[in-house]
Every structure is written in C-alpha cells, then in structure tokens.
Regions:
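Short, ordered loop/turn segments at secondary-structure junctions
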Residues: 4-5, 33-35, 61-62, 94-100
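Residues at secondary-structure transition points
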Residues: 4, 8, 12, 34-37, ...
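C-terminal binding/interaction regions
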Residues: 69-133
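Short beta-strand segments at enzyme active-site cores
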Residues: 30, 54-59, 89-96
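Glycine-rich phosphate-binding loop
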Residues: 42-80, 133
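Active-site rim loops that border cofactor/substrate pockets in soluble metabolic enzymes
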Residues: 22-50
Length: 133
C-alpha cells in the first residue's frame, strides 16, 4: 500500500519494496491511497476482506517539521502498529523527513521501501513458524 501524497518519494519507496519482493519471489499487487492516514484503514479493509494477503507493506512520507507533520506521522505509525499487534503482518515504510531531498535519500540510498518489504516478509515467515509450534 502506498500513500501518493508525495509521489516522487512514493515512487522511490515502491521501487525499493518491489525489488525486495521480487528478490524473494513474493507475489504482490500495488494499491494506492491518497495519504499516510489512509494507509492503516486500507490495510485493515484488505486484511478483514474475503481474500486477505499474507503480509502488507505500508509506504508513504510526511514532509516538514512542526506539530502538523509530527501528528500525521505519529498517528499513521500508531495505527499501523495497532494493526500489527492485532495480528496483521506488515512492514512500516512510512517516513518523516524535513524536506523532499532528505526523504528521497531515505527512500533511495537507505532503501526504506526495501527494508519495509523485507520486514513484512520476515514477519510472515515468523508467523508461519510460530503456527507450527
């Protein structure tokens, strides 16, 4: 799931996530939502739907400093964490950056999207292993 509000950053995050998923032979679909606050709702809808996925990757970015940016980021991450504690397997690739340049560095050079995808895959594997105990 990708938040498209900052499209250039979202594209870079998706590139990293897609590469990581492809490297691991994972099948996936790309779903877009407007912004980071819509990510948890969309993932919850998919997870509770008739054909849930094994794992989800949340990708998006909040730019700027100050109370509004901090609140958007914190609330999106809080809701994603809550989904995780309720058993939804997901990797969180939501970024908070001062500006687009910093966000592009996190998304590209630091491969935040790939890291989120690998986290989701690792958690999906862990869930399978724990189910066998």
């Amino acid at each position: 799931m990708e938040a498209r509000y900052h499209a250039h950053v979202a594209d870079r995050l998706v590139d990293g996530a897609t590469a990581a998923l492809d490297q691991n032979g994972a099948r996936f679909i790309r779903v877009s939502v407007p912004g980071v606050l819509e990510l948890p709702a969309a993932i919850a809808m998919a997870a509770r739907g008739p054909r849930p996925f094994d794992a989800y990757v949340a990708l998006g970015c909040v730019l700027g400093g100050g109370a509004v940016a901090d609140t958007l980021y914190r609330e999106a991450c809080r809701a994603l964490t809550q989904l995780g504690t309720q058993g939804v397997v997901l990797g969180n690739g939501v970024l908070l950056a001062a500006d687009e340049s910093a966000a592009m560095a996190l998304a590209g050079e630091s491969d935040a999207g790939g890291d989120a995808a690998r986290a989701a895959l690792n958690l999906a594997t862990l869930r399978e292993r724990l189910a066998l105990l």
